[in-house]
Swiss-Prot record:
It is found in: Cytoplasm. Keywords: Cytoplasm, Protein biosynthesis. This is Ribosome-recycling factor. PANTHER family: MITOCHONDRIAL RIBOSOME RECYCLING FACTOR PSEUDO 1 (PTHR20982:SF3), RIBOSOME RECYCLING FACTOR (PTHR20982).
Length: 184
């Protein structure tokens, strides 16, 4: 049935949106060390912009410290420079073997700014979920041949319930991240 395919496709797209929310939130600094803070920072490696996570291992030996062990020790200066210019406010130290990054405490003002960023990213993804719902409803309208009004209404209700559940998931992730940011 066409409605099953529409709902299945919609859920797949919404799952990808939830994954993006998690990834976006992972890049927001909270005062705790997390490899996702730096793993996507791009470094010029032999003419290619390569993410740090492809250039070495990123570990968390302490709650507020990241350690990057590059596979190629010759790129350490480039990794260090990329982190410094990333806008995250991190100061890496290079001892010739590994790069250490101590995650500084967040100020109250910075926490408020980050909470706003979280809300903004959350709203963007909620809009994306609603757009996916709209597309699913339009697909349903195109495939209503042979369906009764009750069946159409039932599928529309199902689409709305699924949408609401995904919006709730984003809200829960947002609340969790805001709590993480504002907890001192």
């Amino acid at each position: 049935m066409a409605s099953d395919a529409i709902i299945s496709g919609m859920k797949t797209k919404m799952d990808k949106t939830i994954d993006l929310v998690k990834k976006d939130f992972g890049t927001i600094r909270t005062g705790r060390a997390n490899p996702s803070l730096v793993e996507d920072i791009r470094v010029d490696y032999y003419g290619n912009q390569t993410p740090i996570n492809q250039l070495g291992n990123i570990s968390v030996p302490e709650p507020r410290m990241l350690v990057i062990s590059p596979y190629d020790k010759g790129i350490m200066k480039d990794i260090e420079k990329a982190i410094q210019t990333s806008g995250l406010g991190l100061q890496p130290t290079n001892d010739g073997v590994v790069i250490r990054i101590v995650i500084p405490e967040l100020t109250g003002e910075r926490r408020k700014e980050l909470a706003k960023v979280v809300k903004s990213k959350s709203e963007e993804k909620k809009v994306a979920i609603r757009n996916i719902r709209r597309d699913a409803m339009e697909d349903l309208k195109k495939h209503t041949e042979g369906m009764s009004q009750d069946e159409i209404k039932s599928v529309q209700d199902q689409i709305q319930k699924i949408t609401d559940s995904y919006i709730d998931k984003i809200s829960a992730l947002t609340a969790e991240k805001e709590k993480e940011i504002t907890t001192i």
